[in-house]
Swiss-Prot record:
The keyword Hydrolase applies. It comes from Bordetella avium (strain 197N). This is Beta-hexosaminidase. Its main location: cytoplasm. Pathway: Cell wall biogenesis; peptidoglycan recycling. The lineage of its organism: Bacteria, Pseudomonadati, Pseudomonadota, Betaproteobacteria, Burkholderiales.
Length: 350
């Protein structure tokens, strides 16, 4: 690229957007250059094959002088956006919890190897982070969480999450714990409804929120709050609540990492008003970056109307991998990767 055409060195902004397909359109390139944009979240619709995905992430990173953060929901089980052309079929996190009940040491090993395979494959294709692990407790009632949760015991959840994050870290990938302070106790799906959890703050902190306090920002460089209302604590969903984000998560639990909002287009976010009101509420509560997914019209509306609020730039930058990852062919020949896949296969089949 010639010097005159080099993208401007904008710091990351507080809005994460998405793209429609497998290649960037000119309109999307323009959107990514907006100073309020700080990241891009990918979905299954953005994947045709590994070569195409790698080209797409290269184009996204090249859109700005300081590359945007590229993220994806790639947890394993039913929430795994890329499943073909060599990507490993990752187990649902409940599988790790079931292994724990038989053999805790084997479960810890499986969690680390799963995290490593997950992250190594994503990074080989240019994806910077996955919004994982899910720290919600498995109460057996939540429709949207289900087998995405490790276990019902918060101590087991914390141990398995820590092991999974260790695997991510082996590749240079940051983790994101979700959905603070806990989405597992309510049946409603916040994508389509507004869940309400009527428990007391003491009960939530003792169980659901405990892993966040135990792990902290050294293990979880980022956290995503739930679009769930806890009326005994605040009338607003956690992601829009200064009580939850600033006072409890950051103040009481001492958390100093990045806080992402969940998708502002979800039904659970509708209580805060229009897209601008939702973003303002999340940022005012203490979130560092807000997600606007599947509605480019709302993303553009927000980018046009949101007054610039300097984001926690240093926090956000810490989520970017510090070093380059091996490409796919090099990864396939890597002995650590081969070992991790063998461990996964042996433990799950056994």
């Amino acid at each position: 690229m010639s010097k005159s055409r080099k993208p401007s060195l904008l710091p990351p902004g507080p809005v994460m957007v998405d793209v429609a397909g497998g290649q960037l359109t000119e309109q999307e390139k323009q959107r990514l250059r907006h100073p309020l944009v700080g990241g891009v979240i990918l979905f299954a619709r953005n994947f045709e094959n590994r070569a195409q995905l790698t080209a797409l992430t290269q184009d996204i990173h090249a859109a700005r002088g300081e590359p945007l953060l590229i993220a994806v929901d790639h947890e394993g089980g039913r929430v795994q956006r890329f499943r073909e052309d060599g990507f490993t079929a990752l187990p649902a996190m409940r599988t790790l919890g079931e292994v724990w009940d038989r053999d805790p040491l084997a479960a810890m090993q499986l969690a680390t190897q799963t995290g490593y395979v997950l992250a190594a494959e994503l990074r080989a294709c240019g994806v910077d982070m996955s919004f994982t692990p899910v720290l919600d407790l498995d109460y057996g009632v939540s429709k949207v969480i289900g087998n995405r949760a490790f276990h019902a015991d918060p101590r087991v959840v914390a141990m398995l999450a820590r092991a999974l994050v260790q695997g991510l870290a082996l590749t240079g990938m940051a983790a994101c714990g979700k959905h603070f302070p806990g989405h597992g106790y309510v049946e409603a799906d916040s994508h389509h409804e507004i869940p309400v959890d009527t428990r007391t703050l003491a009960d939530i902190l003792k169980d659901d929120a405990a892993p966040y306090g135990w792990l902290g920002d050294q293990i979880l460089p980022s956290v995503m709050p739930a679009h769930v209302i806890y009326p005994e604590v605040d009338s607003q969903p956690a992601g829009f609540s200064r009580r939850w984000v600033s006072e409890i998560l950051r103040g009481q639990l001492g958390y100093d990492g990045v806080v992402f909002s969940d998708d502002l287009t979800m039904e659970g976010a509708s209580v805060a008003g229009d897209i601008l009101a939702r973003a303002q509420a999340a940022l005012s509560a203490g979130c560092d970056m807000v997600l606007v997914c599947n509605r480019p019209d709302l993303a553009d509306d927000l980018l046009e109307r949101l007054s610039f609020t300097p984001p926690a730039v240093d926090r956000i930058r810490r989520l970017m991998p510090a070093y380059a990852a091996p490409d796919w062919d090099s990864l396939q020949a890597d002995s650590r990767y081969q070992h991790a896949r063998r461990i996964q296969s042996q433990i799950i089949s056994g």
